C-alpha cells in the first residue's frame, strides 16, 4: 500500500494524517485502563491509593510514549540541542516541573540548559534568543496562553522551538519546529507532572 493511500485512509476516518492515527492506535493497544477516566485523588485518599495512582500514571505515560513518540522527531530534537548555541526550557503550572526536570537531565548529559520559571523573565529571555538557540517548551495541552506567548516570542526571534506535549493538533505543535508528542490520557493536576516527567 502506498503512503498516500494510507494518509487518505487516515483522513477519511477523521484523523489529520497517518501520524495521528498511529498515536491513537498506540494509545488503544497500551492498556485497558487507558480509556478509563484517570482516578482523582481526594483529601481522604489512603497512602495505598496515592501510591497505586502514582504508579499507574507512570506506567500509562511510558506505555503511551512507546507507541506515540516519532523517532525521526526525537532525532531532529537531539540534533538541534547538540548544535545549539544555548538551550532554554519553559513550562507553566505542572509543566514547569517537567521543564525543570528536562533541564536537569540535559545538564547531566553536558548540555548547558537554563530553566526560567517566571513568565516575565522567560519572556525577556525568549525575545533575546536568536538563530542557533533552542527553546524547549513543555505543555500538556499545547494551549496554555503564557506558554504560547513564550514560544511565539522565541520563534519570532529566530530560535528553534521544540515542543513537548500530549497532542498533535494544538497551537504549540503547529508553532514548533519539532513536536515531541508523548501521548497519553490527560491526568488530574496532581498526577500530570509525574506522568509527563517519566515520559
Regions found by a protein language model. Name each.
Residues 3-73:
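HTH-adjacent hinge/linker in prokaryotic transcriptional regulators
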Residues 82-198:
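Glycine-rich phosphate-binding loops that contact phosphosugars or nucleotide phosphates
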Amino acid at each position: 500500500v502506498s503512503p498516500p493511500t494510507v494518509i487518505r485512509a487516515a483522513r477519511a476516518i477523521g484523523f489529520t494524517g497517518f501520524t495521528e492515527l498511529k498515536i491513537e492506535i498506540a494509545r488503544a493497544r497500551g492498556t485497558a485502563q487507558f480509556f478509563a477516566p484517570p482516578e482523582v485523588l481526594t483529601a481522604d485518599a489512603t497512602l495505598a491509593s496515592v501510591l497505586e495512582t502514582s504508579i499507574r500514571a507512570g506506567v500509562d505515560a511510558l506505555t503511551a510514549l512507546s507507541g506515540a513518540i516519532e523517532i525521526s522527531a526525537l532525532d531532529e530534537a537531539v540534533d538541534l540541542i547538540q548544535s545549539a548555541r544555548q538551550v532554554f526550557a519553559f513550562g507553566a503550572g505542572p509543566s514547569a516541573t517537567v521543564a525543570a526536570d528536562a533541564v536537569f537531565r540535559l545538564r547531566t548529559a553536558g548540555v548547558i540548559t537554563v530553566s526560567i520559571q517566571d513568565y516575565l523573565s522567560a519572556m525577556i529571555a525568549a525575545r533575546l534568543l536568536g538563530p542557533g538557540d533552542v527553546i524547549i517548551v513543555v505543555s500538556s495541552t499545547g494551549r496554555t496562553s503564557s506558554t504560547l506567548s513564550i514560544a511565539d516570542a522565541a520563534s519570532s526571534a529566530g530560535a528553534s522551538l521544540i515542543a513537548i506535549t500530549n497532542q498533535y493538533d494544538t497551537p504549540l505543535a503547529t508553532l514548533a519546529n519539532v513536536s515531541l508528542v508523548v501521548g497519553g490520557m490527560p491526568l488530574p493536576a496532581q498526577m500530570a507532572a509525574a506522568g509527563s516527567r517519566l515520559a
